[in-house]
Amino acid sequence: MKALRLIIISLILIAVASPVFPASAVLKVQVSPEVWQDTANGATADFLVILRSQADINTLAVAPMAAAQRGERVYQALRQAANAAQPTLQAELQARQVLFRSYWIVNMLVVHGDQALVAYLATRPDVEYIEPDRPFKANLETPDTTTIKVQSPTTPTAVSLTPQWNLNTVHAPDLWARGVTGKGIVYATADTGVQWNHPALQNQYRGWDGTTADHNYNWWDAVHASETWGGLTNICGFDLQAPCDDYGHGTHVTGIGVGTGDGVTAIGVAPGARWIACRNMNGGFGKPSTYIECLQFFMAPTNLQGSAPDPSKRADVISNSYSCPQISEGCAPHSLRAAVQAVRAAGIFMSVSSGNEGGLGCSSIIDPPGLEASVFTVGNTDSSNVIAPSSSRGPVTIDGYNLLKPNLVAPGTIVYSSWSNNTFTTLTGTSMSAPHVAGAVALLWSAFHWLKNDVFATELLLEITAKPLTSSQGCGGDSPTAVPNNVYGYGLLDILASYNMAISKLEKIYLPFLTK
């Protein structure tokens, strides 16, 4: 008996002395090493708890249904999966007085706790992944020149203004001349916020009726004071009830997509579209949860209290000029991937910057969401249609497959647009390229309702009609004449060519599945 007691005591001591980390392999719950690091030595941290039960998005994505129904049906499926799986876990967390925030776009929760809580969650059969939710510094562009003051009031359509070079390059004014400005399309920006009353943006804000502003269902702030930000403060504050841009970057990229102009020159691709926005960064610092929360808001916008979601008010197209560092910061790959797949299944087009890591050479598209097959990834060219040295290249190899990226390229070098405090400036980076494609989709979907919310068909149309560009860099083994290739993708965005192919019904030859 004494020997048995000694064995039991020894086993207990071994269990206490041993790190919790190895338990994850036995329990089949994948716990990221960063989570153990963040909660070591009695520390607490935010982390993502992703449940094993997820909605069957793949089936919904290919199921035949009207465009108007797609967003509603995908939303309902996601909500039902979360409502069925989360109650027992939420009850346990509440009983333990643990702070958490639940999501449905991915069946997951953001939880704040210590290592003992992580160890407990790793024993639950309903949990599949536990991943970090660290704040990280986003690689955002800064102004190339001193900002200038707005010169005069702008017009709602901007068609009377002189277009900036980048708009002429992608042939946006050619569609304006045909009466196509993006009317009827909801354009969404997830970024550092937006100065909603900027003269180049106010009239296009969906929350502005010309007299008063209503930010319900048009704005959401995913930067919460209750979550861990490593001591970061914010010039705008937290949990904002009205749009604010704490950096300027969000105002700039929104201007490229839907801005009017400075009274002399036009800046936006689709100035007739209406925009909504969500802040997913705190002064340039993002978190996986803030990125996911904004995508959820765009799928089913809510009131300012975060309740009464309404998928009928969802975005049509989302412009994403950010990356979530997977290697350097441990950004959660599983949760972000599931979120962008859900967005696509809902018929929402997602234009994403390829990243500014071109200095690393080939296969420098290394961060989500730009590396995902389910998003449309955009590289940066200059006014001579030459790839920018900083623009990240493909192929994507980080997940063990050889995915051709980017999909195509668009202007991103010295692009003039709106900036904070009613000013304008130029910036350079792939952040400037992605809104060109998002704006292009707004124009095409406004012109062709049969194309709206058909993400795959739209991607194919953009790729087929892009201006072919070649590279001798040889990324992914590409020949110097290869099109597509891993530097330019299918080539330079050409909105007029896309429009002409659609309106001349050439899609019946090249894209038979497009005919409605």
Predicted regions mapped to residue ranges:
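Subtilisin-like serine protease catalytic core
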Residues: 36, 42, 60-61, 129, ...
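Inhibitory N-terminal propeptides of secreted protease zymogens
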Residues: 23-145
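Structural recognition of the beta-strand scaffold that forms the well-ordered cores
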Residues: 47-50, 101-102, 108-112, 129-131, ...
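Hydrolase catalytic cores
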Residues: 254-257, 276-284, 346, 412-483
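Protease zymogen maturation seam
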Residues: 21-24, 69, 73, 124-186, ...
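C-terminal subdomain of the subtilisin-like protease fold in secreted/lumenal serine endopeptidases
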Residues: 99, 164, 308-321, 375, ...
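Catalytic-core segments of hydrolase enzymes
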Residues: 253, 307, 311-419, 463-466
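Bacterial N-terminal signal peptides
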Residues: 7-19
